[in-house]
Amino acid sequence: MKPSIILYKTLPDDLLHRLEAHFTVTQVPNLHPETVARHAQAFASAQGLLGASETVNRALLEKMPALRAASTISVGYDNVEVDALTARKIVLMHTPAVLTETVADTVMALMLATARRVVDVAERVKAGEWTESIGPAWFGVDVHHKTLGIVGMGRIGMALAQRAHFGFTMPVLYHARRRHQEAEDRFNARYCDLDTLLQEADFVCVILPLTTETRHLFGTTQFARMKSSAIFINAGRGPVVDENALIAALQNGEIYAAGLDVFEHEPLSVDSPLLNMSNVVAVPHIGSATHETRYNMMACAVDNLIDALQGKIEKNCVNPQAAG
């Protein structure tokens, strides 16, 4: 008899068939309490859980006594109570490697769009404001040869450093929990403390997960330390930044512009002052959102769950100690 799993994400047919070859699959639209209650027997017997974005907490786990593995279609897992899973000996799998290059492309796009004011001037053209040769009011700033500061030198930080160093001849500074020798050797990246990075970088790019240590890491003090010409990019997690402090820094001219893929509360409220600022490029958490990469993430998550329920957790496991 096949193990049973709960699937709370729509998958392409080929990936669904791959799951069905190994498991009895119950598909649900979400993990809301009413959904769990409606499918109580399926949740109670499920050994696996696969999906994205929904909250996985102790209350849900109480309804899933047979659960052995959860697989998220994401690299981040701040919506999952990992400690609760680990206490129950439930492994959590994620998809870190397959989205690296795509997210780095997104960060680079935000850097270029903010520096060259691509969104702002495109909207002005559409509004019929281009009636003569453009002047300084339409100008942006250069990207090449400017200093890039990366906060969080993981896989995505490395991919961004590669683009900046080789493609745009940018000196690279970085701040991370530990030195990254490969970044220093390949890209001549310079490790520094956060204050030094903020004071010297022309672009400050944040690529951090959300933890208790990183929540509101960027606030009034940090923005005040940045150059008034600096461009701030956040492609990690929204709550790493105190959004009110960022808004104030932009309104007061403490920094030049911001490119934001993530926000403290998502979706971003239509009333947010950020949406009324011409020097802000705001996109809806599109970091990995290409057809190719999202498919690869789903395929990776499917394979992760198959492996985990066969006792194979050598890669992509957040909490391998749970299997001990």
From Swiss-Prot:
The active site is at 237, 266, 285 (proton donor). It is found in: Cytoplasm. It is an enzyme of class 1 (oxidoreductase). Keywords: Cytoplasm, NAD, NADP, Oxidoreductase. The keyword 4Fe-4S does not apply. SUPFAM superfamilies: Formate/glycerate dehydrogenase catalytic domain-like (SSF52283), NAD(P)-binding Rossmann-fold domains (SSF51735). CDD domains: GDH (cd05301). Its EC number is 1.1.1.79, 1.1.1.81. It catalyses: glycolate + NADP(+) = glyoxylate + NADPH + H(+); (R)-glycerate + NAD(+) = 3-hydroxypyruvate + NADH + H(+); (R)-glycerate + NADP(+) = 3-hydroxypyruvate + NADPH + H(+). Its main location: cytoplasm. InterPro entries: D-isomer_2-hydroxyacid_DH (IPR050223), D-isomer_2_OHA_DH_cat_dom (IPR006139), D-isomer_DH_CS (IPR029753), D-isomer_DH_NAD-bd (IPR006140), Glyo/OHPyrv_Rdtase_B (IPR023756), NAD(P)-bd_dom_sf (IPR036291). GO terms for molecular function: glyoxylate reductase (NADPH) activity; hydroxypyruvate reductase (NADH) activity; hydroxypyruvate reductase (NADPH) activity; NAD binding. Pfam families: 2-Hacid_dh (PF00389), 2-Hacid_dh_C (PF02826). GO terms for cellular component: cytosol; plasma membrane. Catalyzes the NADPH-dependent reduction of glyoxylate and hydroxypyruvate into glycolate and glycerate, respectively. NCBIfam families: PRK15409.1. Belongs to the D-isomer specific 2-hydroxyacid dehydrogenase family. GhrB subfamily. Homodimer. This is Glyoxylate/hydroxypyruvate reductase B. It comes from Salmonella paratyphi A (strain AKU_12601).
